Amino acid sequence: MRDYADNDSILLKHGWCEMLKGGVIMDVKNVEQAKIAEKAGAIGVMILENIPSELRNTDGVARSVDPLKIEEIRKCISINVLAKVRIGHFVEAQILEELKVDMLDESEVLTMADEYNHINKHKFKTPFVCGCTNLGEALRRISEGASMIRTKGEAGTGNIIEAIKHIRTVNNEIKYLCSLDESEVYNFAKKLRAPIDLILLTRKLKRLPVVNFAAGGIATPADAAMCMQLGMDGVFVGSGIFESENPQKMASSIVMAVSNFNNPKILLNVSLGLGKAMHGNTKVSNKWKNKSEEDNS
């Protein structure tokens, strides 16, 4: 059994993620977008070949970004640089760790590389973020070495409904865990298929034992603030910015909304005059459903 409260490597990676709390990480695909994100006050950029809204409309294989693009963008900004790898593709992760990116996202948005196994993230010095739809999935990813969790949501749709569903599901399952008699906890752990040590730690903390960001469909300052009011530590956003009428203003407003999520007056001010938000998609069909928790992990 791994001791999650007393391990130097784990504590170092988790500690780095703690510094991201209250921040916004933005999906970008070029230098121009990265500069918009930095100017807006983002704490980091997630570099992709295409933002999620574009990935949803393609049928080809979505792979990790060309390392050269990461180098080009990193030279032009001073904030954290993140990159996605395919689920289970530990060699993509090795390559990007060698490139010294700040964080890796083992992402369902890319085409899955291994249908049965996620990456053993304990083998890496670079912290990982992974998506989840429920508490059991979150704790399994943490047991594999994830230092940060995010909701899966519906990336690239501008539709926040799935992200909110995942946030509330995790929150409600934690509340239920905390309400159980001690003798009932072990059976609940079996139902979640989650390690008992992480179940007990979550019960003690009354929250996930790692930083937890919202992601998937966040398109407005109000969306971002709603996620924060539901207990998230920060947000990922991409298509919602760069498919809006005024990306720079939208990006800055979302950052302000996350920093002031409990202040309606500021939320009103940052929501004024943003122009048209991304068109979005109300048909939440989940292009990446085959990579969902129910099917794979």
UniProtKB/Swiss-Prot annotation:
Keywords annotated in UniProt: Lyase, Pyridoxal phosphate, Schiff base
E.C. designation(s): 4.3.3.6
Pfam families from the UniProt entry: SOR_SNZ
Active-site annotation: K84 (schiff-base intermediate with d-ribose 5-phosphate)
Keyword Lyase on entry: yes
InterPro entries the UniProt entry points to: Aldolase_TIM, PdxS/SNZ, PdxS/SNZ_N, RibuloseP-bd_barrel
Residues reported to bind D-glyceraldehyde 3-phosphate: R168
Pathway assigned in UniProt: Cofactor biosynthesis; pyridoxal 5'-phosphate biosynthesis
Keyword Acetylation: no
Record note on what altering L82A does: No effect on glutaminase activity. 4-fold reduction in overall pyridoxal 5'-phosphate synthase activity
GO MF term list: pyridoxal 5'-phosphate synthase (glutamine hydrolysing) activity
One of the protein's GO biological processes: pyridoxal phosphate biosynthetic process
Top enzyme class: lyase
Reactions that this protein is recorded to catalyse: aldehydo-D-ribose 5-phosphate + D-glyceraldehyde 3-phosphate + L-glutamine = pyridoxal 5'-phosphate + L-glutamate + phosphate + 3 H2O + H(+)
Consequence the record notes for mutating M46I: 2-fold increase in glutaminase and in overall pyridoxal 5'-phosphate synthase activity
CDD domains: pdxS
Residues that coordinate or bind D-ribose 5-phosphate: D27, G156, G217, G238, S239
Homology family: Belongs to the PdxS/SNZ family.
Subunit comment: Homohexamer and homododecamer. In the presence of Pdx2, forms a dodecamer of heterodimers.
Function per UniProt: Catalyzes the formation of pyridoxal 5'-phosphate from ribose 5-phosphate (RBP), glyceraldehyde 3-phosphate (G3P) and ammonia. The ammonia is provided by Pdx2. Can also use ribulose 5-phosphate and dihydroxyacetone phosphate as substrates, resulting from enzyme-catalyzed isomerization of RBP and G3P, respectively.
Stated name of the protein: Pyridoxal 5'-phosphate synthase subunit Pdx1
